[in-house]
Amino acid sequence: MYIEKYWGEYIGGSDDSLSLLAFLEDQNKEEITLTEIFAKIGLEKLDWNFRQTTEYLGFLHSNGVETDFNFAIDVIVDIAAILLECKINKVVNLHDLDEYDAPSRNIRIIATTEELRSMDKALLDFTQNPLEYDL
């Protein structure tokens, strides 16, 4: 896995990471768009401003359990890493992201050029203004 060096250490190691993986697993499909992820977990309400998590972020799992996210920027950083993995290797195996609970199933996150630019801007803002974020 291309992102293996970072995943679980610097990225992918939070409660929000586990919630994101549960969400991706629950979608039961190989390909999911970034637009769909944003809509289903509530990130679209933040209008690409992830400094403060002012809106509820979460989803209703197919098993009936409400799963929430604490910090939008955690989810964005994790999604960015998964997007990078998908760019390099076309897919990512959920089991590689969580070897304890995730099934061995490939997924791919698809993003438009505009969405990728917006992700870049959000990550750049985070690196330049980390104390502005609610972590």
Label the model's feature ranges.
Residues Y2, Y6, Y10, Y56, ...:
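Sequence-level detector for tyrosine residue identity
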Residues F23, F50, T54, N89, ...:
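Generic preference for flexible, low-structure residues
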Residues K5, K29, K40, K45, ...:
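Context-gated lysine
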Residues M1-K40:
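N-terminal leader/targeting peptides and immediately adjacent processing regions
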Residues E66-E132:
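Amphipathic protein-protein interaction modules
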Residues K29-D68:
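Short amphipathic alpha-helical segments and their helix-coil junctions
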Residues A39-G42, L46-N49, E55, E115-L135:
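Domain-length accessory/inserted modules outside core catalytic folds
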